């Protein structure tokens, strides 16, 4: 519960993963997470605040680098909500292994690493050296539902027991 106390101190709240997956505004079909041994692989997550998309738009046109940075923090917070759902306790994370960040970028925008620093910085704030992942920051022109940022997180965890993944296709009507 140490990590959750740090989140509280930062004024950050994890959302209800099951509720968010049932909403499935994008109609996407994928699993929330999968494990291989003690490695937890997450599907991409986007910025959510108060149950709604946060800071949507194109970075470098509609959004500033600073707004993109904040969006990346919230996208990582969405990842942490899935980690908590899967593992039951964020303290089970032993190492952030890899973070891949996609930035909905204006033509010619080349500051994706500065935007994705928002996600990396939050990992380090929470986990210290264990929060330093390998990383890629990729610019793209367009993300689902006009999200500004999407991150894909992989972590190494301790202990046994992982909640089965939520599958978005189960909720598509």
Predicted features along the sequence, with ranges:
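N-terminal presequence-like segments and the immediate start of the first folded domain
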Residues: 1-77, 81, 85-97, 105-173
